[in-house]
């Protein structure tokens, strides 16, 4: 037998041996028949194989799952697995929430986060209930739709009462150092709330807080015309004429999604490093590693060089690790800390929602996720600000920029007073809200007072 024959036989034997070890059970093959999408075949197979091993221990569970997948329009029972300590499931070096994993496999391959899912009322063991069992039946969950934001109605002829043409938080004194609050999966700690709630009201408390920088928004009357109110007219014949007359006095400015939902700039102290990263994927990870594959969903800080980098920056960069997961779903932006060290976030939209001072810095520890921007709340603020003049609307541009530092924090509880004193930080610009503001400001015309860096 010559060498070629020996090599051929050896290769054939190895192939046979490999196929034995990679044997896929009939139950797994059958369930994979309902898989959605073409990507990550191996990952999906491992996820389903892991599930089948768990369901085999429960009589009728696999059959119930097959019934749910084959007849999606028919009612089905819960298909459950035991809840792990941290609620997550590991599949091939990747951890995820079980109901998200299997909804991604069998219904929505583009699913990014559990924030996009809501359980149906018939589900007895939804993930959100935090019971010992978790339902992974993909037809016991529905996908949350992105809310349609109403257009902003800009008056063509603005008339303001003397002394009331500007939003009052222009005149609120910024603290010498930002307040600090700490967040966890159970919410903000009580110490944080007691030390920062004195400065600003949340949407629910803003009316009762006389010191709130947003106080003028709460008392702002709604625009002269609201499409939802038009249906309440007692005289159906007057509706069309009233609409025409009122719409002649206002310009409708609608929100539209941009090609890139955000851009990210990386800084070391007060120096920008590298190119701006444009986010076209709704899920983006900013980490401290290099990215040889140039994935569009990863912004890797490890590959960026800076000749002015000192030892503190070098040490901080080593601790960024897995960094932060940013995801944009249903008009909301979330930040999840994947690093072993905390991240620190300054988001005026988030601070407004929680009733903190606009400049407050929130600490997000490892493993925690925080909503850092809400398009609907921004839309309400924008609609109300239009009645307060150009400067009031322009002030909202600050809400469209989010600053985030890695490992090292800043503010009243830290020796660094400003974000530019932290070794490693990023600035996130939200393109959709910024473009919406720009269109509204264009409709409003020139400001009554000159806009400057100190206005």
From Swiss-Prot:
Effect of residue 409 to S: In allele Mad-10; pupal lethal
One BP annotation, GO: compound eye morphogenesis
Summary of the knockout phenotype: Mutants exhibit defects in midgut morphogenesis, imaginal disk development and embryonic dorsal-ventral patterning that are very reminiscent of dpp mutant phenotypes.
Modified residues (Phosphoserine): 25, 453, 455
Residue ranges with Polar residues bias: 229-238
A Pfam family annotated for this UniProt entry: MH1
Region (Interaction with lack): 221-225
Keyword Metal-binding: yes
One annotated GO molecular function: RNA polymerase II-specific DNA-binding transcription factor binding
InterPro entries named in the record: Dwarfin, MAD_homology1_Dwarfin-type, MAD_homology_MH1, SMAD-like_dom_sf, SMAD_dom_Dwarfin-type, SMAD_FHA_dom_sf, SMAD_MH1_sf
Composition bias type Low complexity, residue spans: 192-212
Keyword Transcription belongs to the record: yes
Domain called MH2: residue spans: 261-455
Modification(s) after translation: Phosphorylation on Ser-453 and/or Ser-455 is required for interaction with Smurf. Phosphorylation on Ser-25 by key/Nemo promotes export from nucleus and antagonizes BMP signaling.
Localisation per UniProt entry: Cytoplasm; Nucleus
Tissues of expression: Stage 13 embryos display expression in the dorsal epidermis (at protein level).
A cellular-component GO term for this protein: RNA polymerase II transcription repressor complex
Domain MH1 residue range list: 26-150
Binding-site residues for Zn(2+), renumbered to this chain: 78, 123, 135, 140
Keywords: Cytoplasm, Developmental protein, DNA-binding, Metal-binding, Nucleus, Phosphoprotein, Transcription, Transcription regulation, Ubl conjugation, Zinc
Region (Disordered): 192-243
Family: Belongs to the dwarfin/SMAD family.
Subunit: Homotrimer. Interacts with MAN1. Interacts with Sec13 and Nup93-1.
Function: Required for the function of decapentaplegic. May play an important role in mediating Dpp signaling. Involved in the BMP signaling pathway.
Protein's recorded name: Protein mothers against dpp
Lineage of the organism: Eukaryota, Metazoa, Ecdysozoa, Arthropoda, Hexapoda
Gene name, Swiss-Prot/TrEMBL: Mad
